Amino acid sequence: LARRRLGASAEVLVRTSPCRMGMRSYMTWNEVPAAPLDPILGVNQKFQADTSAEKVNVSIGAYRTDEGKPMVLSCVKKAEALLLEQSDLNKEYLPQRGDATYVQLCQKMLFGEKSKLLASGVVATAQTLSGTGALRLGAEFMKKFAQGKTVYISNPTWGTHNSIMTQAGVPFSHYRYWNAAGRDLDLAGMLEDIEAAPEGSVIMLHAAAHNPTGVDPTTEQWGEIMAVCKAKKHVCWFDSAYQGFATGDLDIDATAMRAFADEGLPLFVSQSFAKNFGLYGERVGTFSITCDTPEAVKAVMSQLDIIIRNLYSNPPKHGADSVEAVLSPPLRAFADARSDPLFRRKHRQDR
């Protein structure tokens, strides 16, 4: 009956149907190759699969209790308890650029309470998905507004720096950093490579506690690096993933970046709270761009809003609320004096 109603065309469809011929007319993804494991996270996956009772996980930089269990900082626990007591607690969407109060507190942590840049309103900052999200946001911004510019990254570096630029389609190269023979900073090689980079390149610098070497320039060496970057009109991209870990002091660890800012060099800054707040799974960070005028900040923020909207729409709220609470009275004093890992690290150094 169906064939009589549809006519001859139905017979043709039946006879030439791919299913009838043992063929498939849609993608099956059988040719997709398996990707290699992430160099860091992949080791953790192997740890989870290992059945040995003697195994020890040192693959991911995360705080653990003496029993090797995940640890939440006391100040973060107190912050979350305070959040639950708030009468206006909500889980609403944040704007693309994030929570305004959180952003202001993060800016002060990076640039300082008395920053002239912040007082002048010339720092554009957006909340991001931790440091990795900040790096990707910066790369996407570069792809739109700094086409053809190359990012110069230290050799060695955190491996994901390279892959983020690759995935975003941003060209990158490397400058010398580690002197293997002397087990210290290869300052001469670093300066030579930065000076050889085309004028107006983007130089990525680790703000403190260089990953993976742990070797940071001295104050005098930072001055030499800054002089070359200024002479070549480079944009300096500070990745601040470990603020407080190098010296135990948040302000001291931001000294180099603040000096570059005070000198008027254009900056990108990626900030992460995964390590120094132990908020690994909350994905809390920021991305900042220093500008010449408040009007330029408005334009830059509008473009960051668009990029964020099309990457992940808007950032998560809970982790930012926790950071905001810890950086605000009275928890800021509690964190500084009692439970902050930075305090404990400084205490060990003092002993």
Predicted regions and their residues:
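N-terminal mitochondrial targeting presequence
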Residues: 1-26
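Walker B catalytic acidic pair
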Residues: 240
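Conserved PLP-binding catalytic core of the aspartate aminotransferase-like
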Residues: 335-351
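Class I S-adenosyl-L-methionine-dependent methyltransferase catalytic core
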Residues: 143, 150, 163-166, 309-315, ...
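N-terminal "arm"/small-domain region of PLP-dependent enzymes with the aminotransferase-like
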Residues: 26-98, 105-108, 316, 320
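Conserved core segment of the aminotransferase class I/II
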Residues: 105, 262-337
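Conserved core of the PLP fold type I
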Residues: 77, 82-84, 88-231, 243-257, ...
